[in-house]
Every structure is written in structure tokens, then in C-alpha cells.
From Swiss-Prot:
This is Copine-9. SMART domains: C2, VWA. Ca(2+) 1 binds at D163, D169, D225, D227. Keywords: Calcium, Differentiation, Metal-binding, Repeat.
Amino acid sequence: MSLGGASERSVPATKIEITVSCRNLLDLDTFSKSDPMVVLHTQSRASQEWREFGRTEVIDNTLNPDFVRKFVLDYFFEEKQNLRFDVYNVDSKANISKPKDFLGQAFLALGEVIGGQGSRVERPLTGVPGKKCGTILLTAEELSNCRDIATMQLCANKLDKKDFFGKSDPFLVFYRSNEDGTFTICHKTEVVKNTLNPVWQPFSIPVRALCNGDYDRTVKIDVYDWDRDGSHDFIGEFTTSYRELSKAQNQFTVYEVLNPRKKCKKKKYTNSGTVTLLSFSVDSEFTFVDYIKGGTQLNFTVAIDFTASNGNPLQPTSLHYMSPYQLSAYAMALKAVGEIIQDYDSDKLFPAYGFGAKLPPEGRISHQFPLNNNDEDPNCAGIEGVLESYFQSLRTVQLYGPTYFAPVINQVARAAAKISDGSQYYVLLIITDGVISDMTQTKEAIVSASSLPMSIIIVGVGPAMFEAMEELDGDDVRVSSRGRYAERDIVQFVPFRDYVDRSGNQVLSMARLAKDVLAEIPEQLLSYMRTRDIQPRPPPPANPNPTSAPEQP
């Protein structure tokens, strides 16, 4: 049963405030200096169109403005959030859209700002031919209320009896209201069996999930009677807000549970029971952004399936086929995930391996060979470097088999085991087309790796059934090996075919894939830091006089 028609809308990971400064701008005014203003545009994921998001104030007569007006953006780690900053010289008598008023622009992703040292970046302004346009400085700051966690406990009294042979089995469903009037489910309590006066266990929920930072936004709570067949009976509902809930820190709050249908039919209807908020508290916790800002680096490693079941790379039917017109599923998966993670890795050097191939010249089978053919240094420069090495390997190795995951998982785990101070977190992307041949060893490797600062993403390509991969995912049943359970859930598996855009839009396909496979990484990183009691380091001090953009590796 669909509870309340809740829409499936993402809750922003957090809200980020961007502060903008510029240095050494072009001077377009004859008798004074420029009067600059910055316009921020964001790019639509679906249409790729740029839309104006907001503007800073105009600062008169300066080439080095520090703008007071900030941009507040919803931040999703798992999405490539492209930004465009246009700088204009504003003459009150002219329109800023005229080319003569344009001072330059910079393109970058929100993740690049957050992933910069201390969540600060400096970029050159470009766009005016033959001119040095100066630089733009961007600083990201997480809004403080985004780190709040609310903990509450509720009970009910004299709920309507819904079961013929016994009392009700009640549970609560919480919904956050959206700006368009719809509601999004954000929490469900446990079911308390056979009672009209249930007391639910205390639970915690991020405040942003409850109200998205708007303390007066409506929170709707439905009361249901649980049924085994899923057709849960609606008992009633009530509404509140975060601000109202927070008053329970000093007093009990009692809500009437109302059933609109009963209220219309029965004149003497009063309510379907009451729900009492017994306790409510708010605590702050460290966030993903805190760790990134404090210098934690995401180390990205790639492992690609070179087994024969992928088909001859020279044939169009192969999953590795290098078409001049479009990327293969392997290349799309690599690009989709890598282009987001690379923003959080300062050196942009990524180890990349293949498995399941025969290597020249002697035909040795390898389950962990460097794509760049350099055993001493498997690092590739940027995601484009990984793709280049992948394409080169397809021309030189022979696809063979079988499909072994354990060697490359253990390889990354050995590197992760050397880091225990929270300064680095490892993300391994495995792209494969089929059935795993070393399930026992892979489970053992995952269980061992679950105590280390690492996560594993597995993307299945092609038409195969991936039941074994679902088993490794561990969302429903924690992965175990020899009676030992994984300390944390560190594996995320998705079949790529579920994300392919039917119209053939590869950009949209990659965005959908990245959104799903990367969504769990921030929480997995936080779970590791919490279990090890590792606090984020303070961000490095800002450079008081930045003048030029840092060189790219």
C-alpha cells in the first residue's frame, strides 16, 4: 500500500552558503574603476540549460570586490552540480546583458568548491578575448542548522480499534511538506502490536529531512493500523511543525488524531485518539562537509571486468565496444562516478586495474593488472587518463576469465589499512558484466574491509541476472563470512540498465547512475568516523591575499 501518496523527492544532503570575491577585474569605466556584480547560473541536469539562480549586490568603484550577499544552494554529494559565475560591470543607465558590460566568467561544480582546500577555490575568469580578466574566489560554508539531529519519543492513547479479533497494531508515518503542496515520506516508526495505547521507541532524524531547514513548514503525521498483507488501515492524522515539536523540550504536547472521513460522516465525532510527544531534543553532529573541509580526501580506485563474457571488443555487440559515436556502458559508468568523486581528491591521480584477462606476452591470467601497464605506479591522471588507459588495455590484452573480485578488494584494503586518522577514505568502483566466481573469498574480503576507511561500488553492465551482487550489497542482510558479520554496510550495487535513458541521452543516464551509487558514500564515511571516534580536523587558514588560481595537476 502506498502511504499517503508520498512523492520520491531527495532531501538535500545539506545547504551550502557560497561567498564570492574577485581580484584584479577588468576596468571598463573611463573615469573610475568598474562597478562589479556576480550573477550565478545553475545547470539543469535533465535539459542541460543554464538558469539564473541569483545575483550579488553591486559594489561601486573597485576591481577587488568582496561581496556581502551570499548564494545558498542545496548540496547533493551524488550529483554533478554545475555552476556558472558571470561577472558584470553595472552602469545604472545600461543593461547588464550588453556584451560591453561583461567582465568574465568561471565554470565549476559545487563539489569542486567544497572539495577545495578548506572548502575554498580560486579560478581564473575567462571569456573576454585577448584580456586577462582576473580571478574569482569562492568559499563554501555549511549552514549550521543542517547538522542538527532531532530525537523524539511519542505515545498514543485510545486509538480507534481496527482489528475485528483484537486491538490495533499502530505505527506512525511522518511526512515533510513540499513547496508545491505535496508530501514526502521521511520516517516510519516501528509497529507496536495489539494495543490502542502504544508507546513507540525513541528515534532520531536529521532536522533537514523533517523540514528542509524551514522550522515552520508543515509536518504531517499519519497513524496506521498494520496489516500483514500491506493494506494498512488509516486511523487518522495530525499536523505540526518543527518549531511546535521543539516546544516539547519543556512540556508534553498532545495532538488529536483526526480521520477526515469520519469527521464528515458523524456529527458527534471528536477524534480517533490522541498522540502525545513525550520528549524532544536536538543535538548537532559532524557532517560529511565538516570532514571534507578539514582535509579528508576521497581516494578513488577503479577495477574493470576484462572477462570473455563481455564479447570481442572489436564487435558492436561487445559491452566493451569502442564506438566512435557513443561511450560503452563501462566508460559511462566510469565517467559518471569518477567525475563526481574527483572533486574530492586533490592530486586527481587514480589507480585503475583490470581483472580476468590474459596479459601479453606470455598470456598470464591476471585479476589485478594496472590499466596503464605500470606495476610500480598504477595511477592515471584524472578520469580522462583512466579512460585512455582502459581503451589502450582493450587493444593489448586478451579477454578471458574467470570473474574474481577478491584480489582487487584486498589490494585497496591494504592501502586503506595504513590510514587510520581519518585523513583519507577509499572508494573502489568495480564494473562487471556477470556472475562472480569467487563469492566466498569476496565475502571474506568485504567483511575484512568493513572495518577500514573504504566503500565499494559495484556497477553491473549488460543483460545478466545479478542476484549474487544483490547478496553483496548487504542492505537487507549484512554480509557475513565464516560466522563473522561485516562491521558496516560498505557495498552498493546497481545494474546499469536501470538507469539508461530511453531517448539515448547519455548525460542523463550517467547522472541517474551517479545519483544512486554515490548517495550512500557520505553516510558510509560518517559511520566509519563515528565508530572510530575520529573528529574532523579544523580547516586550514585562508590565504589573506590570494591573487591567482592554483595550477591544476
